[in-house]
Amino acid sequence: MDKDWMVLLQQQNQLSKMMEVNRATERYGLSLSEQDAKMILAERNHALQRERRVEFGEGIAPQIIYEFCDSDFIEQDSYADTIIRLQEIFYMYKNEMQDEISDEELLHFMKEQFETVCFGDLDYLAGTCLAIFSQAIRAGYRGYRASEGRGEYGAFDEVKRWDYDLYLEMLKELCWR
């Protein structure tokens, strides 16, 4: 009986913490209903079971919310689903990187790629950016530690991106003859 009481109290604390983050996210036009928060917490448990992970404390969802709340690519209609998907991706790649990277480093890396390389595409984030980065981590790369995961993807990116200077030069040539 004591065990059930403790679990119930822990769940209530986690729910309270999830509802607290609304204060920070409301200025970005994002908020969670109590039902959304419960759904995120339930999906957290499923993701932890699927990835065979154990987590103590409040979980990663509040940190994900704080990290991603100012994104231009997250809208209110898909907010809860996006947080759930980011949570799943986070746990999957914590395992893939064999816990070599801290939560903060992984979150910073995820956010930077989500904004600048993936432009909000969660499948590209998980299937390309994090897959490539996790291979580097497993192979022994540790350069991310100095930058806390920021600015690291360029060294591993296999996809040719736009050359900004060339683009401007061509734009000037075409438009300002």
Task: Describe every region a protein language model picked out.
Residues 2-45:
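Short terminal alpha-helical segments
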Residues 31-169:
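Acidic, low-complexity, intrinsically disordered interaction modules
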